[in-house]
Amino acid sequence: MNLLKKVFYWGLRRESVTATVDGRIRQQMPVSAVIPQGFLPLEGGLASDRVREFDQRQAPIAITARFRSGSTLLWRLLRDHPAVTAYYEPLNPRRWFDAEHRGTKVDKTHRGVCDYWSEYSGISPNSVRWDESWTSDDLYLSKLQPKHRLYDYIKLLLGQAQNRSVLQFNRLDFRLEWFKHRFPGVSLIHLQRNPRDQWLSTFQKHPPCSKNATIANRGFQDEFYLLSWARDLSRYIPLLAELDDLHPYELSYLIWRLSEVFAQTHVDYTLQYESLVKNPRQTIGELADRFGLIGLADMPAVESIDARSVKRWGSYADPDWFKTRESRCDRLLDLFVFSNFVAEDHYGSAPGDKIKTTSRTADCL
């Protein structure tokens, strides 16, 4: 049994790892690795606190969100705005620009949505050099990776937009550094949802898995690419390959936390799903003021927003069940990702500086 699995088993029997064990584990760990680019130290504050040198009230917008975080709701609101051309998930494998490939299916949980592809109607399939890897491979991209085809595709969408362009992504989480480097004049908005509700919402065709399920026994239906994301990202975050004995929610939470780190570092604005559905007019009004979307809060669709999908996690397990597993995941990330990885010199950090980050789970509970 390898070291990580020993820690997992031990953690299942105790709520936290003590400082003594912490020190002993660190002594057994390999030499500190170099963090992959994109995991920037956060001592300088959140990216949203730093002003970028372009007019965000007129600039194109890109939305980044985990699956089942309300991104379709936000996209629908923006789509209805007369001064906006809002593209739905450009990296979706259905290829919205290709009528023969995309089909006609619309998710019944996406209220008020008749199609996802109208904005793509002027784009010829022959003009896009589509790459299947965009959907599930190379999910992490540093700013140094060219990815010419992906760049050309996004540039094409921005250029084809009849109005101010908005691109709603669910596969940009770990590509944010690349995106911001390649498209420095595009504002980045992060939509965040409670990780518990977000995970439960991924069970669309099947009931949620048992509270005793593990990743190893495949006691759950993976409807939103959780395992494939873990496999791809484990090339950079080896911890994600050592999770067989954990509950599927814990894997979802780990990726959620890592996604949060990227967002905290790179985006210009964070919008909480819970605020959006509980206080839609105020929340959308603040978003509209920040990004110059005049009249967005007065769109008719705002009246149809409700908070029925908030805190559904309580029907699955009690708070202690979730807190125990989230605390264990936070500890594992601190031990094997954040605290154990040394920042590269080109980030201006001294040798031995450690990443410092805090969980923001409480903000959306």
Language-model features: where?
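PAPS-dependent sulfotransferases, especially Golgi type II membrane carbohydrate sulfotransferases
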Residues: M1-I61, L226-T270, L276-L365
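PAPS/PAP-binding and catalytic site of the sulfotransferase fold
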Residues: G70-V84, F179-F183, S201-F203, T270-G295
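PAPS-dependent sulfation machinery
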Residues: Y87-L167, I215-L240
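Short, hinge-like loop/turn segments at secondary-structure boundaries
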Residues: R102-V106, K205-C209, A288-R290
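Conserved phosphate-donor/acceptor-positioning beta-strand/loop module used by diverse small-molecule
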Residues: Q168-N170, R182-K205
